[in-house]
Amino acid sequence: MAAGKVWLVGAGPGDIGLFTLKGAAVLQQADVVVYDSLVGEGVLAKIPEHARLINVGKRANHHTMVQEDINKVLLEEAEKGNKVVRLKGGDPFLFGRGGEELELLSEKGIPYEIIPGVTSPISVPAYNGIPVTHRDFCSSLHIITGHKRAGQEYDIDFKALTQTKGTLVFLMGIAALEDICKGLLAGGMDPDMPAAVLQKGTTAGQKRVVATVGTLKEEVDRQGIETPAIIVVGKVCSLADKFAWYEKLPLAGWKVLVTRPRQHISKTADLLRKKGAEVLELPSICTVPVENNSRLYEAFEKLDTYQWIIFTSPAGVEIFFDEMDRKEMDVRSLGQAKIAVIGEGTKKKLKEHHLLADFVPSVYDGDTLGAELAKELQGNEKILIPRAEAGNRKLTELLEQTGAKVDDIATYTTCYEKSRLIDEKKELETGSVDCVVFTSASTVKGFVEDTKGLDYTKVKAACIGKQTKAAADAYGMQTRMAKKATIESLIELVEEMKQEN
């Protein structure tokens, strides 16, 4: 068997937007992903379903697997012929022990590549308004590990660091903050030198404490800081309040859980991130074509006899045209049929097939679609509705009441999924998540399936429309509904919820 290959991939500091394009591309090809606890949840959500996962932990004072065993795992998986991605928080070569992981691979002749990551000593200060270099304040940057091996003294030359007059960044040093400050002062540093501790940079948990070397430990104890955090020492720290930008974004500091179908890239998540939110994506449902689509195939044989075709979801559009392709049919087969869609998302999906919707309801839900379209009918039309197996029956009933003949055909089923990597229930129980966004009643049901036993009365739910809100209300959630059933209006709702919080 041919040997596989290993990629050491830097996942960046936490914000998925700082994960590199090359890293993301390699991740999609992985057979096996060996990942750290410091890899951001946004990056973890991008791991493909087909990849096998190996969690090696590596948080402060708690390692799921020791380094020597991690090295062996990489070797063994590559020797099986796998494409192995070693996903590491930050950059693999900056205190990431990437060099140690390559030693064994190199010795055994296993091919490998290094994909650098955006590193926290630069990105985390940047997200806090601190430029690590500035020609008016310093001309050098020094990155130091604040971690010391058990039973050993620091081998840091604090006097030499002080004499550089550059910016100092200490990683993994919060537990030793007092020793670091004392060492710098003993090395001759001015006690009034600006200094900062930056917590969970680039995420919703971002927090900073700016003080001086002489007062930093006391100030951190007073305000409270959680790990991971970095220590920055230098005159540039005085610029933090002046240059702070991230915290000014409307959703900065909020962590939002977005539920979505697995097959769909979430526009909602992208827009929330642009507003500053940390987004946790939960593929809570998936759509699967029904095993026997014979009823749809029968409808295909008489497509030109329908006056209306109604699509109630983007998935319905996608599967309908996939089945047409399978039967080697094209849009000419639709004849003179008009097309109605339930909302903007479905309208856009239809446009991908070079078709424009003839009818969109004023409110994007099945009841309004049925009521408003019924007013357009003469009473003898033939209507085709290819949609989910558990579709809204009221839509069909409203149309049939006009005398129309409706072929309501289930073309796909909705199944509920559980995340492999993220414990959504724990995230909500610990208060890490500020709001959950639902874009359909199905995503509500998928979320509930994934979080059984959760106290739903504590869940703040932002819902896109009436049916989605009703589904969330049924579980006692604290629901709010967007003014319009659009993604843009839903984002505005989340902003309002944060302002009211």
Q: What is each residue range found by the language model?
A:
Residues 5-8, 31-33, 51-54, 82-86, ...:
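Structural motif
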Residues 2-11, 55-60, 141-146, 280-286, ...:
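Short, basic, glycine/proline-bearing loop/turn elements
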Residues 41-42, 60-62, 119-123, 140-143, ...:
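Short gly/pro/ser/thr-enriched loop/turn and capping motifs at secondary-structure boundaries
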Residues 15, 91-164, 209, 359-365, ...:
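Class I SAM-dependent methyltransferase SAM-binding "motif I" and its flanking Rossmann-like core
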Residues 1-16, 21-118, 123, 222, ...:
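Class I S-adenosyl-L-methionine
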Residues 151-196:
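Conserved anion/nucleotide-ligand pocket segment
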Residues 13-14, 51, 66-70, 74, ...:
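Signature of uroporphyrinogen-III synthase
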Residues 29, 103-104, 119, 123-126, ...:
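Acidic, glycine-enriched active-site microenvironments
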